[in-house]
Amino acid sequence: MGLIYKGFLKIFHKVWKNVEVEDQKRMKTLVLPDDVSFEDFKYGEDDDPYHTFSIYWPKDKDLTKLPILIDIHGGAWAYGDKELNRPFCMTMAHRNLIVMGMSYRLIEGVQVNNQLEDIINSINGFIKVAKERKYNLNNVFLTGDSAGGYFALSLASLLDRKLINPILGLNLNIDFKGLILNHPAFDFDIMGQTHFWYPLLFRAMFGKKYKKNPIYVNTKNTKVLMDNVYLPPMLFITSTGDDVMGEINIDVLKEIKRYYPNIEVINNDIDPKGHVYNVAYMNSDSAIKTNDKILNFILSISKK
């Protein structure tokens, strides 16, 4: 197991290094909106470059009245930072939202527990700034793409079950009005049945005895995350062109609907695009339509 695990890690991180090269090329082709301002902030008490977040807002608007969207980037728990989703955050701010996106440490050096700590600390840092600027903290939505979708759902579920402090020793005082799961990577039971290497990834994420890790235990599948748990209105985004999570998301949606039958779904099957297409290619026609639907979802709930 030791040699197999080490071999997996070597290949896994090499794959994501290659993704980084391609992402740099892709991001140079994107056209960013010119009516959005942003500011970068640090969180935590150290100078770790991953302990940063950014706030984006539309120019010349009354920011005290706008909905807030907190975005958690994906990258298989092992890749990326807030810059990866800067174009997506900017395009959503262009739609008259205040958007916050954070960096968090990656599993090459830490585990998922630490990543959740980073995400919570970044949100607490944002809350402090939001209070100073008189943003409307009663109108906050949470989204994440791919692995970020896992973090978004897990955070909302752990928050309702009051497990954040007992497990992580942290506090988070916020109510999310809505949850947007964008091509999410979760339900480890279903994922583990699709590829032999997923248990190796879970070990990297949660430790050698990952099945005993309290975060794994409390976020490992849809039943644990949703059964007898209050979650806000949810929007689930997938695509038949998603060759990463598409087939898994079909089974995940079936599970979700056992607990939340009224979940709203965007399934891009008419013009199928790849994994997290509305984040990666936010200028494309399909992405524009999907991101407009995200906005409509937010506004429909904001008015209630």
Show where each model-derived region lies.
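Alpha/beta-hydrolase superfamily serine-hydrolase fold, recognizing
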Residues: M1-K304
